[in-house]
């Protein structure tokens, strides 16, 4: 009497794939945590707004060199306040153009959920076709170029940033720095500027990108 053949275990690849989360939740939570802590640190280092608009501290600069010197010193002292002003101008411009805001949010969401925070072992499947990480990156880069340079989004962002920077430079040129500006020594990387300059290298999102390329 012959024995029945042994039954080999079979893994359901489709079920295993479906059980995996669509995004790397740990990297996403780490990114949000770093963003939140950086914003809190930035807000804690902002200068009093009344000091920013103190009318007694405004005077016309004597020369162009004096203007640049004032701008440099005021940027070092009011950097968080200036960042907030530029952000407010940018936010107001986007809110006044809902379509551009929707397009920009859609583009940002595509980068976050289709590439940056998508699980590395979770392939991107669209229209019945599986895309590699390099193909996904190339598609997102091309889409970003089209959206920024061939729609109203790019011109809107450029005009908003230009207005914000012009306001900052105008204030910095006419705001007379006092001794507090010259005596105060601050770290080169702090608050919001630190997050902008360094978080990309230290956040979990950067680790995910490095692992994909």
Swiss-Prot record:
**Region Disordered, annotated ranges:** 1-21
Entry's Gene Ontology BP terms:
vesicle-mediated transport
Q: Main localization of the protein?
A: membrane
Subcellular location(s) of the protein: Endosome membrane
Alphabetized InterPro entries for the sequence = Prenylated_rab_accept_PRA1
Q: Which domain of life is it from?
A: Eukaryota
- Transmembrane portions of the chain: 75-94, 98-117, 137-157, 161-181, 190-210
Keyword annotations of the record: Endosome, Membrane, Transmembrane, Transmembrane helix, Transport
Question: Do you know which Pfam families this protein is assigned to?
Answer: PRA1
For this record, the Gene Ontology CC terms, alphabetical, are: endoplasmic reticulum; endosome; endosome membrane; Golgi apparatus; Golgi trans cisterna; trans-Golgi network
Topology relative to the membrane, per the entry? Answer: Multi-pass membrane protein
Can you state the subunit structure given in the record? Interacts with PRA1B1, PRA1B3, PRA1B4, PRA1B5, PRA1B6 and PRA1E.
What does the function comment of this entry state?
A: May be involved in both secretory and endocytic intracellular trafficking in the endosomal/prevacuolar compartments.
Which protein family is it in?
Answer: Belongs to the PRA1 family.
Name used for this protein in its record: PRA1 family protein B2
Source organism of this protein record? Arabidopsis thaliana (Mouse-ear cress)
